[in-house]
Amino acid sequence: MANVVVTGEQLDKAIREVVHILEDAVGCTAGPKGLTVAISKPYGAPEITKDGYKVIKSIKPEDPLALAIANIIAQSASQCNDKVGDGTTTCSILTAKVIEEVSKAKAAGADIVCIKDGVLKAKEAVLDALMSMKREVLSEEEIAQVATISANGDKNIGVKIAQCVQEVGKDGVITVEESKGFKELDVEKTDGMQFDRGYLSPYFVTNSEKMLVEFENPYILLTEKKLNIIQPILPILENVARSGRPLLIIAEDVEGEALSTLVLNKLRGGLHVAAVKAPGFGDRRKDMLGDIAILTGAKHVISDDLAIKMEDLTLAELGTAKNIRITKDTTTIIGSVDNSSDNVQSRINQIKVQIESSTSDYDKEKLRERLAKLSGGVAVLKVGGSSEVEVKERKDRVEDALHATRAAVEEGVVPGGGAALLYTLSVLENLKSKNDDEQLGINIIKRALQAPIKRIIRNSGSENAPCVIAHLLKQNDKELIFNVDTMNFANAFTSGVIDPLKVVRIAFDFAVSLAAVFMTLNAIVVDVPSKDDAGAAGGAGGMGGMGGMGGF
């Protein structure tokens, strides 16, 4: 494998071409009248989606230089998606426009460092202006409006998500699952809880696309101990492996030989297993493990105080649940199947008594957190349809809408449809620049701020964007938007065309930051396959398998 250094105009041209391809593929999904994109798979039917992040992630150009550029963009999109779960389409539209305008300025001989200074100065002013526009989300109707917009105008999705928030509260746990039925969307409230601990190794992941561990009908082993060696849990691991069901281990920690053995057996396929740290610290950890035991029907939380040893545990003494979902940061236990509601209610009453008798505000707060986790439950959005393709496309929109709803509840909302970004233009009019090239950078952001609303209007089949923008900018009502569903101007909040501030803010921030990286990028070193590599690969004849690696 040889490598090549690409610089100058060749690099600039490649960046422009890749960004244009990505924006063309992703931008068509923007707005309620945006179109879908089909992503081919190595097996099965193509996936149909309007999820901008999925589209960006799937684009892998054959050319090594184009692939390197696409990977930089995909990494930024991934960070944007991790932060807020939505906004990658807006981010790609903004990035493409900034890079297009910067290329023109570079070709005219402008100082790129000064342009970058102007771009970053304008970015901070725009972010401050967005914060001043926000309005808090208070009502169920407003929550439904936000979810509807993010679901590309699907009111049923908006109403169901608002119903979930009403069921479990604004801080409650809401998950999305595929249903085997034909009903498009249904809501099910079940027992369960979520805590802030993720998987201890990424090798436990079962869904590599979303980096999740997803288990159905798992056993749950609870212990206050730290697991360093595999021997104490070997008997129960063998029993679980024979049962064919997954296992979740919740312990103070799992490390060393114990962790490596669990990972190895997961990779070999001998056991579907995952391990997470127990939530909390000290006595609170003990209490929360007790809560999980009550919820899942586990007979014991193994500790030094308990007479029973881990080696003597039976399957009947482990906890169970309908589903478990683990990310790198959180664990969600859904619908414990064997727990007694009487036991849960008794535990809830016990915590309420502790709250009443506690004299410490801090202790009361922690007890209330435990109470909320036990009593709040989990709302499950079940997505159905007549085909797998339809279900997956709808599930993408439901997940985007759910992320947007959480963002709106957290930071509030701003006028939607690209209007909020457009209205920040006014703050850039009075922004002082040090020189002409820095002013060029500010002007680039001015043009970029118009790109999202232009794309949304274009996707609706209209070429009237310049007139719409001119009308919005000449009047003083910053709640006025253009509704592409009705093709009329309307108030953002009464018509429900609103966006979560957090989504708009992060999409803009990431877009400008990514464009700034490309502005001063002077060279890329890319690997290119040589003829020798091709010959060596042909003569190697493959590595063969590694033989049968037994279980424990």
Curated annotation (Swiss-Prot):
It is an enzyme of class 5 (isomerase). Disulfide bonds: none annotated. GO terms for molecular function: ATP binding; ATP-dependent protein folding chaperone; isomerase activity; unfolded protein binding. Its EC number is 5.6.1.7. GO terms for biological process: protein refolding. Belongs to the chaperonin (HSP60) family. This is Chaperonin GroEL. It comes from Ehrlichia canis (strain Jake). The gene is groEL.
